[in-house]
Curated annotation (Swiss-Prot):
Cellular-component GO terms for this entry: mitochondrial matrix
PROSITE patterns, A to Z: AA_TRANSFER_CLASS_3
Protein name (record): Probable acetylornithine aminotransferase, mitochondrial
Gene3D superfamilies: Aspartate Aminotransferase, domain 1 (3.90.1150.10), Type I PLP-dependent aspartate aminotransferase-like (Major domain) (3.40.640.10)
One Gene Ontology term of the molecular function aspect: pyridoxal phosphate binding
Record InterPro entries: AcOrn/SuccOrn_fam, Aminotrans_3, Aminotrans_3_PPA_site, Class-III_PLP-dep_AT, PyrdxlP-dep_Trfase, PyrdxlP-dep_Trfase_major, PyrdxlP-dep_Trfase_small
Species of origin: Schizosaccharomyces pombe (strain 972 / ATCC 24843)
Main localization, broad class: mitochondrion
Subcellular location: Mitochondrion matrix
Cofactor(s) the protein needs: pyridoxal 5'-phosphate
Length: 441
């Protein structure tokens, strides 16, 4: 099948000739005499190996491109795993970060912090227009998505405790979900391979079935404090939630007095084609809590947990905190990023490039049915669905100068920056097609 045939096509001498007709491996993996290889060796001697890294040493970025230590240019359809949504080395991001660094980098949360206050105001005003959350929202700033989700779990349980007392602490999550790697967020991440060796995890969590409205009442009951769901699943395999599923979740949460948490860490802030991924159901399935992170400051570490006024009223000084949460540099940049990502210019480009990508994906499905079985996603959070694990496809695309990401369920994730230009999309698609041609021979 796919992997076996593709490996044979590379190794056999006859197939090598046919293979080279379609692809030119201009970005081969570094050889022992290169600067990149020496850096990779040093990393292995000094850093704990928890990442399956590509053999690429990123030296700099510019827009939708990454450059390695040998000066080779790559089209970046990973965006730092949906982080650099405004592209690499955005001039205004760089200017604002440098200016804030020259004034104040950190003062602790003992003092008021104007950049954090300004960012919270921008986010809250945006949600007032684009989300159905009742009443004004309030925000807790953290450093990443995992911390934002941990905060969401704590706040949801605290709100349930204050209203209902002990015994209402259950958290419901879904198959193929990914919410983080700390003990709490790992407990509500579905993939068992991430959990092996780290048990026991958080008690009183229940896994339910994603996109199955009929099954919700089996899992959401009087003991449920919160339901956490991704409006578009990312790492577990690109899968948008059906509107009727989110509506059913809202109704189930209302029935038992549970909080509905939308994890928009990967799908939010414009990547779905809307600034807030849940806004397509804002009038009928608004959340009580939203978590965001990845693109919030275009690469600077930041996360945010946004809650309704009812939940905020149950959280008091000393009940949560973060040393670096609300960092002035990240928040100063974040204010610009939220405004820019919510602009009509960016959102129109997301929808335009979505059409360009999916039009070619339709061709791929028709031309290469032995390799591609379909695609899914919203906006520029797309998954090309392979018939078998796509590791060889991703490797060969990289060796032609295109960076892609694996995803669950045999997906290849396609995550360009949201301001990506037409010619970059076209070139990336051409590399994908040449790789598919080669692997299909």
């Amino acid at each position: 099948m796919f992997q076996r045939r593709s490996l044979l096509s590379v190794r056999s001498s006859g197939s090598q000739i046919a293979f080279r007709r379609f692809v030119s491996l201009t970005h081969k993996d570094p050889t022992p005499d290169t600067t990149s290889c020496n850096i990779i060796k040093k990393e292995g001697a000094n850093i704990i190996s928890v990442y399956a890294r590509y053999p690429v040493v990123a030296a700099k970025g510019e827009g939708s491109y990454l450059f390695d230590k040998e000066g080779r240019k790559y089209i970046d359809f990973t965006s730092g795993v949906a982080v650099t949504s405004l592209g690499h080395a955005h001039p205004e991001v760089a200017r604002l970060a440098a200016d804030q660094c020259s004034k104040l980098v950190h003062s602790s949360n003992l003092f008021y912090n104007e950049p954090a206050i300004e960012l919270s105001n921008v986010i809250n005003n945006s949600l007032a227009k684009n989300s159905g959350i009742a009443g004004p929202t309030k925000i807790f700033f953290a450093n990443c998505g995992t911390e934002a989700n941990e905060t969401a779990l704590k706040f949801a349980r605290k709100a349930a405790f204050e209203k209902y007392g002990e015994g209402k602490s259950q958290i419901v999550y879904f198959n193929n979900s990914f919410h983080g790697r700390s003990l709490g967020s790992l407990s509500i991440t579905a993939n068992p391979k991430y959990k092996r060796g780290f048990q026991p995890l958080l008690p009183d969590v229940v896994q339910a079935v994603y996109n199955d409205p009929a099954s919700i009442e089996q899992f959401v009951n009087d003991k449920t404090a919160a339901v956490i769901v991704e409006p578009v699943q990312g790492e577990g395999g690109i899968c948008p939630a059906k509107p009727e599923f989110l509506i059913a979740l809202r109704k189930a949460c209302d029935k038992v007095g549970a909080s509905l948490i939308y994890d928009e860490i990967q799908c939010g802030l414009g990547r779905s084609g809307d600034l807030w991924a849940h806004s397509i159901v804002k009038d009928v399935a608004s959340p009580d809590i939203i978590t965001v992170a990845k693109p919030l400051a275009n690469g600077l570490p930041i996360g945010a947990t946004i809650v309704s006024s009812k939940i905020a009223a149950e959280i008091h000084p000393g009940e949560h905190g973060s040393t670096f949460g609300g960092n002035p540099v990240a928040c100063r940049v974040g204010t610009f990023c939220v405004n820019e990502l919510g602009s009509s210019k960016i959102l129109q480009n997301v929808r335009k490039q979505h059409k360009a990508l999916t039009s070619r994906f339709d061709d791929f499905v028709a031309k290469y049915p032995n390799l591609i079985r379909g695609y899914a996603g919203r906006g520029l959070l797309l998954g090309l669905q392979f018939t078998e694990p796509p590791a060889k496809f991703i490797e060969l695309a990289r060796q032609q100068g295109l960076l892609l990401l694996p995803g669950g369920n045999n997906n290849t994730r396609v995550l360009p920056s949201l301001n990506v230009k037409d010619e970059v999309i076209a070139k990336g698609l051409d590399i994908m097609e040449s790789t598919l041609k080669a692997l299909s021979k």
